[in-house]
Structure formats: C-alpha cells, structure tokens
Swiss-Prot record:
GO terms for cellular component: apoplast; extracellular matrix. CDD domains: cupin_OxOx. This is Germin-like protein 8-13. Pfam families: Cupin_1. May play a role in plant defense. Probably has no oxalate oxidase activity even if the active site is conserved. The keyword Ubl conjugation does not apply. Mn(2+) binds at H110, H112, E117, H157. Keywords: Apoplast, Disulfide bond, Glycoprotein, Manganese, Metal-binding, Secreted, Signal. It comes from Oryza sativa subsp. japonica (Rice). Disulfide bonds join C32-C48. PROSITE patterns: GERMIN (PS00725).
Length: 219
C-alpha cells in the first residue's frame, strides 16, 4: 500500500485554511459601519461603531446625487462615496464615485493604489484609457452612454471629454478606500526642489516653477 508524504499534505492544508480564513474574515459579522472619529484607516478598515447605534439611515448616502466640487484646472467635478464619506461601506470591499466632465475637460492621469475601477457612462461620451506597467502600452477607447470601461488596480488612467456636452459617469471600486493619487499634484504640489523635478522630467525650470505655482507646490 502506497503512503502519501505527510509534509506536502500538511502544507497544502495550512495554505487552504489560511485562504479560507482570509476570505471569511469579513463574514464574521453582518456589517461594520466605520467609527471615523476613533482613528485612521488600517489594512483591515476602520473600527466598527457599536451595532446598537446603527440605523437604516447609516446605509443610505446621497453623496453622488449631484455633481461634486469643480476642479478648475481640469474642468471636472468629482464626488466620492469612499469610506470617509460613506462609513457603511467599511469592510465591504466596495465604494463609488461620480465624475462630471465639461466639454474639453479631463480627469488627468491618476491611480487608485488599493482598488480596481469599473466606469459606467451615464450621459454623454468620453475617452477612457490606462497605461500598462509592463511595457507602457496605452489602452484607450471612446465610451458612449451606457458603456463601461475597467481600470486595473494601481495603473495610471484617465478620462477625456472630446464632445460638446457634459459627460457624466459613475465608478465602482473593489475597495472601500481605493485611494487617489493624481500625477500632476504628485509632481508639482510638493516641496521637492525644482532642480530635482527638472532632472526627473526634462521640463524647463521655468515650466516646472509655473506648474508648481499652479498646483500649490514649493521648492
């Protein structure tokens, strides 16, 4: 009678149990409405509010009912329903946002380090695209009303309204706090010395200083 090596069996069992434990952690309770005042977000989310204090109103949000604040350099309005604005999504692995892009407006190159994004165009049309990390290939396409486009987690991506009417789109994310880093602000809204930025971007010093002034940077 053949015998099965014990070590591979034990290792396989441990890996399986670890995977099950990881995927069921969020199922140990029905929900975990974030207690935002108690501290910052962590890899496992915010601390939960006591269930006895949670009401149906906590699961409702009107955060995306109207356009957000206009970001003038880009002629785009952004409204978010991340965990900070919508505490009920804490620990659920979902969140959403709304973007209203004026004609000629753009959502500039940016990343969501902690989540993938699924974009749905509600009105108008826009060009959506992302840049791969392996070979810097650009994948872009015009997305019309009713169409969707997906952006993989962490990759630089953008939207651009090439039409003559405002484009409205909603996005869903695979994280309650996907994060947001806009490339323009990362480069020009910091205090990194201008000479360093010039070396890293090959832009003229005068242009770097102009952009730092525009985006609130220094140095």
């Amino acid at each position: 009678m053949s015998s099965t090596p014990l070590l591979p069996v034990l290792l396989s069992t441990m890996i399986l149990l670890s995977a099950v434990s990881t995927t069921t952690t969020a199922l140990t309770q029905d929900f975990c409405v974030a207690n935002l005042p108690l501290g910052a977000d962590t890899p496992s989310g915010y601390q939960c509010r006591p269930a006895a204090t949670v009401t149906a109103a906590d699961f409702y949000s009107g955060a995306l009912a109207r356009p957000g604040i206009l970001i003038r350099p880009f002629n785009t309005s952004l409204a978010s329903a991340f965990v900070q604005q919508y505490p009920a999504v804490n620990g659920l692995g979902i969140s959403a946002s709304r973007v209203d892009i004026l004609p000629g407006g753009v959502v500039p190159l940016h990343t969501h380090p902690a989540g993938s994004e699924l974009l749905y165009v509600l009105d108008g049309a826009l060009v959506a695209g992302f840049i791969s990390s392996s070979d810097n290939k650009v994948y872009y396409k015009e997305v019309s009303k009713g169409g969707m486009f997906v952006f993989p987690q962490g990759l630089l991506h953008f939207q651009y309204n090439t039409g003559d009417t405002t484009a409205v789109a909603f996005a869903a994310y695979s994280s309650s706090n996907p994060g947001l880093q806009i490339l323009d602000y990362a480069l020009f809204a910091n205090n990194l010395p201008t000479s360093y930025v010039v070396k890293g971007t090959f832009l003229a010093e005068a242009e770097v200083r102009r952009l730092k002034s525009k985006f609130g940077g220094s140095g």
